[in-house]
Amino acid sequence: DEPVIVVQDRGRVVRVPAGEVLYLKAELKYVTVRTAATSWLVDESLSELEARLGSRFIRVHRNALVARSAMARLERRDDPDGHDGQEGWAVQVRPTGEWLAVSRRQAAAVRETIAAQ
């Protein structure tokens, strides 16, 4: 059975299959669940989601998990997190083309994952 993430959406409950999730990103008190079609906010911690969803996702930063299958490439980028003048590693998520910051500590693991695809 594929794990699901249960989200509240305008008064209804939606079950999002983990296989449709491109990334999970923690922002303040919520986690953004991003699919190719849309985004939702959930009130579950990133650590809880990481434990529940298993190896399908890789932690790229303290605030983000990316689906291994959604990682297109890793490169040095100016301002991946919007901090003026800083350069850092970032991973491009397919099919949306969005870039997410990758911590220095996680860059090698992300590089290996992309190379193994």
Report the location of each language-model feature.
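Conserved binding/recognition cores within well-folded domains
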Residues: 1-102
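C-terminal output/interaction extensions
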Residues: 104-117
